[in-house]
């Protein structure tokens, strides 16, 4: 039966077909009226007659089932209302009729602005997160991998509450991840430009494959361009690009925040282990980036606002309101952030969870920084944490400063980043002096899974009274006797262990109304 012959048919004694609105490899979609419900507009999708074999019929029915179950769980997935066979035994299913534009059309002439992108990307992630968390299928909890995330499969419709509502379409090649299923090579399915490397290999897939496709799409949404270009459009050309070609860096003309650039590039990691391990991690990162953009500039009053009762009397503290994670005045940020994006993990440092101080030679001069290597997921989680720092001096048997940095998250607890400055060395003295004079330092994060480049950046502010002490310590330590630095280091570590419960207890009381920094004595 041709598409024209279906025009104005009454299907299943209920759905009046009105017009053909779309067609693809899997079939045709019609606008129709549901006569049983007073003529409400619906969409009806038929399986293509060229695909009428038992295997494709089963897949089409599964697509309808997956969409129906997911649509009940998330407003960001198209809802399926009915399924059946017409008089010719051709399968069809009925879904909500949506009027809007797909993202492919929206970005055809210009990319999305960052603010709009973040709102849309968050909703896409909500829909994907729902799919990845799974459905109950044949009595078993099964995660769903979409396998065809791309701009044309994401629709934007007007919504009175949200302004723009995202709907993920086309679960036609979605994969149910079932526990009893053996891992085996699968036939390739997907759209070449958006496929993950493992998808092109026909490997068993999980949610991280969709995250790669999402990364390709997010790059395209922000730039209007693809992150990768093959030598030719064949399967082999795209296979080579997805496996071995580095994504193009973002052009400065798009004015993409460094934290957003890093997030997209993380999603585009060649290895699944190098990507965010769940969509929930991406959602938290988007929230942190949005807070960074929306928060107001820091006033001089906020920079010096004292909260003497935040910590106990021997740890007097300053609370500094931040515009977002790691934002410093506009005159400094672009220069330093450009530098940080170029930094590589030193070849003489082990690729493991460590912390060490480092002097940045930026256009603004020499800047203090703390280099940190953590799991990638932990890094993304910590972008919206409360930042705390404190400096402890021990003069005997060897003058040394314990530089304490803590990233505290109400849900995930503290991440302790201790570092030691030997005040009998020239580098230790100059670093303490630098911290005291500048009153700020940079936190540079490198991921264990992908340690080549700096992934994220934050800044930390040192309280004025701590700055004064650091400068004094740098001067007076020169005349102090030295010896047995390892003993001093061990004693400082014991003191940190004693202070940890007090610091954590007080940080847990800080209201999470805005991102805060805490610097204490």
Curated annotation (Swiss-Prot):
ATP binds at residues 21-29, 45. Transmembrane segments: none annotated. Autophosphorylated. It is an enzyme of class 2 (transferase). It catalyses: L-seryl-[protein] + ATP = O-phospho-L-seryl-[protein] + ADP + H(+); L-threonyl-[protein] + ATP = O-phospho-L-threonyl-[protein] + ADP + H(+). Residues 15-289 form the Protein kinase domain. It comes from the Bacteria. The keyword Cytoplasm does not apply. The active site is at residue 148. Its EC number is 2.7.11.1. Belongs to the protein kinase superfamily. Ser/Thr protein kinase family. Protein kinase that regulates cellular motility via phosphorylation of membrane proteins. This is Serine/threonine-protein kinase A.
């Amino acid at each position: 039966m041709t598409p024209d012959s279906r025009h104005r048919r009454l299907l299943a004694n209920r759905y009046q077909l009105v017009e053909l609105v779309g067609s693809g490899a899997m079939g045709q979609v019609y606008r129709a009226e549901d006569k049983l419900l007073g003529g409400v507009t619906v969409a009806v999708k038929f399986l293509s007659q060229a695909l009428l074999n038992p295997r494709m019929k089963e897949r089409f029915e599964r697509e309808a089932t997956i969409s129906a179950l997911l649509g009940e769980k998330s407003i960001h997935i198209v809802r399926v209302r009915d399924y059946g066979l017409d008089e010719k035994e051709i399968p069809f299913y009925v879904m909500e009729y949506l009027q809007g534009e797909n993202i492919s059309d929206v970005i055809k002439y210009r990319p999305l602005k960052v603010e709009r992108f973040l709102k849309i990307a968050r909703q896409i992630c909500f829909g994907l997160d729902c799919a990845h968390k799974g459905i109950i299928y044949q009595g078993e909890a099964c995660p769903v991998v979409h396998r065809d995330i791309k701009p044309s499969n994401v629709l934007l419709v007007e919504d009175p509450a949200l302004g723009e509502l995202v709907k993920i379409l086309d679960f036609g090649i979605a994969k149910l991840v079932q526990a009893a299923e053996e891992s085996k090579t699968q036939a390739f399915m997907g759209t070449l430009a958006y496929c993950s490397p493992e998808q092109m290999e026909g490997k068993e897939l999980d949610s991280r494959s969709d995250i790669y496709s999402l990364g390709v799409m997010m790059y395209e949404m922000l730039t209007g361009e693809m992150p990768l270009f093959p030598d030719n459009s064949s399967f082999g050309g795209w296979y080579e690009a997805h496996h071995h070609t580095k994504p193009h860096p973002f052009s400065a003309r798009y004015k993409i925040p460094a934290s957003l650039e890093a997030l997209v590039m993380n999603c585009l990691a060649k290895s699944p282990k190098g990507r965010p391990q769940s969509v929930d991690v991406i959602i938290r990162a988007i929230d942190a980036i949005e807070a960074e953009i929306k928060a107001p500039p820091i006033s001089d009053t906020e920079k010096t606002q004292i909260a003497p009762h935040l910590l106990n009397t021997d740890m007097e503290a300053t609370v500094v309101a931040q515009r977002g994670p790691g934002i410093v005045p506009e005159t400094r940020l672009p220069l330093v952030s450009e530098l940080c994006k170029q930094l590589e993990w030193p070849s003489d440092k082990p690729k493991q969870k460590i912390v060490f101080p480092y002097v940045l030679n930026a256009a603004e001069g020499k800047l203090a920084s703390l280099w940190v290597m953590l799991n990638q997921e932990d890094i993304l989680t910590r972008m919206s944490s409360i930042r705390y720092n404190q400096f402890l001096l021990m003069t005997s048997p060897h003058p040394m400063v314990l530089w304490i940095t803590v990233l505290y998250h109400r849900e995930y607890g503290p991440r302790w980043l201790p570092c030691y400055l030997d005040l009998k060395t020239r580098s230790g003295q100059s670093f303490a002096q630098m911290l005291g004079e500048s009153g700020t330092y940079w936190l540079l994060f490198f991921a264990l899974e992908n340690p080549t480049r700096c992934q994220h950046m934050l800044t930390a502010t040192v309280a004025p009274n701590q700055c004064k002490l650091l400068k004094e310590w740098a001067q007076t330590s020169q005349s102090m006797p030295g010896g047995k630095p390892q003993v001093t280091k061990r004693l400082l570590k014991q003191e940190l262990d004693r202070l940890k419960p007090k610091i954590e207890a007080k940080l847990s009381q800080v209201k999470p109304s805005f991102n805060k920094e805490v610097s204490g004595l």
